[in-house]
């Protein structure tokens, strides 16, 4: 056990009051986060570390190969198709996917002209979600016909086409460069923060742009977790935990009366309502104890459903990931809606 005097090396350092999220600009592809105050120099240390991990280490999904009927290599053309194979491959690289499994998935195009094929026309299964369905892929003229099969999987960072070659693949299979990272851009800025009369502390402002397959707040959390896990091997001691603050007993806390309402009263879309029913979530109290990650594991539950539920809960002063001890209570508070 480490000497309590030594623990002052880290316990006496200034820590941020919390992570502030700019709600006015927050979207499913952009987030602005502020952490302050930090000890001088920690703004650059944390900002640079998070930026590098965000750009290099988060997993995403991408198409890794394509095989088009009648095409042997990428420099050929397809009869009655406006784009040549090279252009089609470039368009396929920009298809944004979310894959809810670690398995390699097969995606198909089966179409006859005249028709414009967009990302939303790709034939997938329930585990593959296309995030930019309006993205153009190719155009088939009258009398044209396209039959194509693609593979897609989850991965990390950038993987060149050469590494996406699979031994034994059918002749005509064309490997594709894959950019798996869901992060499009990361900026950070370090300015001065005030603590009392001192202004020589750091304020870290972090901006994150994603492709929509991961929420910016989740991306930052995942990156921080990666950094924490990597650094943990350098700690060669155990320490006594700091005395816990006295917590007000749950019985004395006034519960939000909305917690006792049925989820049927939320006026959700049919898809979202069915997902909650299949997950056996009956009350709002049951719902708020679920984390975003747990909800996204629910069958057919996607980002749109998540956003819908979060917005409705926010109007009630509630959120996902809440901790409700001894739920459900033996008796609902007076005046609470009956389920």
UniProtKB/Swiss-Prot annotation:
Enzyme Commission number(s) of this protein: 2.7.7.6
Keyword Phosphoprotein assigned: no
GO (cellular component) term, any one: cytoplasm
Keyword Transferase (UniProt): yes
Spans annotated as Alpha C-terminal domain (alpha-CTD): 250-339
A biological process term (GO) from this entry: DNA-templated transcription
Top-level division of the source organism's lineage: Bacteria
The protein's enzyme class: transferase
Gene3D superfamilies assigned to the protein according to its UniProt record, in alphabetical order: 5' to 3' exonuclease, C-terminal subdomain, DNA-directed RNA polymerase, insert domain, RNA polymerase, RBP11-like subunit
Gene Ontology terms for molecular function: DNA binding; DNA-directed RNA polymerase activity; protein dimerization activity
Family of the protein in this entry: Belongs to the RNA polymerase alpha chain family.
Quaternary context: Homodimer. The RNAP catalytic core consists of 2 alpha, 1 beta, 1 beta' and 1 omega subunit. When a sigma factor is associated with the core the holoenzyme is formed, which can initiate transcription.
Role, per record: DNA-dependent RNA polymerase catalyzes the transcription of DNA into RNA using the four ribonucleoside triphosphates as substrates.
Free-text domain note: The N-terminal domain is essential for RNAP assembly and basal transcription, whereas the C-terminal domain is involved in interaction with transcriptional regulators and with upstream promoter elements.
Protein name (record): DNA-directed RNA polymerase subunit alpha
Species this protein is from: Anaeromyxobacter dehalogenans (strain 2CP-C)
């Amino acid at each position: 056990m480490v000497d309590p005097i030594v623990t002052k090396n880290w316990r006496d350092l200034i820590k941020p009051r919390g992570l502030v999220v700019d709600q006015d600009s927050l979207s499913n592809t952009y987030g602005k986060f502020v952490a302050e105050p930090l000890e001088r120099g920690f703004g650059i240390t944390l900002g640079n570390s998070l930026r590098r991990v965000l750009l290099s280490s988060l997993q995403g999904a991408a198409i890794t190969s394509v095989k088009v009927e009648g095409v042997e290599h990428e420099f050929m053309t397809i009869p009655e198709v406006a784009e040549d194979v090279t252009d089609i491959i470039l368009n396929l690289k920009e298809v944004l996917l979310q894959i809810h499994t670690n398995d390699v998935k097969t995606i198909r195009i089966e179409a006859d002209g005249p028709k414009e094929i967009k990302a939303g026309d790709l034939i997938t299964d329930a585990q593959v979600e296309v995030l930019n369905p309006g993205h153009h892929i190719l155009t088939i003229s009258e009398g044209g016909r396209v039959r194509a099969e693609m593979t897609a999987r989850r991965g990390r960072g950038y993987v060149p086409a050469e590494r996406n070659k699979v031994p034994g693949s059918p002749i005509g299979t064309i490997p594709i460069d894959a950019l798996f990272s869901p992060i499009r851009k990361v900026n950070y800025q370090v300015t001065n923060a005030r603590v009392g009369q001192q202004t020589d502390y750091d304020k870290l402002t972090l901006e994150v742009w994603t492709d929509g397959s991961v929420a910016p707040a989740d991306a930052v959390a995942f990156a921080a977790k990666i950094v924490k896990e990597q650094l943990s091997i350098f700690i060669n001691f155990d320490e006594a935990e700091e005395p816990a603050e006295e917590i007000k007993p749950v019985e004395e806390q006034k519960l939000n009366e909305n917690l006792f309402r049925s989820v049927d009263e939320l006026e959700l879309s049919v898809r979202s309502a069915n997902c909650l029913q299949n997950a056996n979530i009956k009350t709002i109290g049951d719902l708020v104890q679920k984390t975003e990650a747990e909800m996204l594991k629910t069958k057919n539950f996607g980002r749109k459903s998540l956003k819908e539920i979060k917005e409705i809960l926010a109007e009630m002063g509630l959120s996902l990931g809440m901790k409700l001890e001894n739920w459900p209570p033996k008796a609902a508070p007076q005046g609470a809606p009956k389920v």
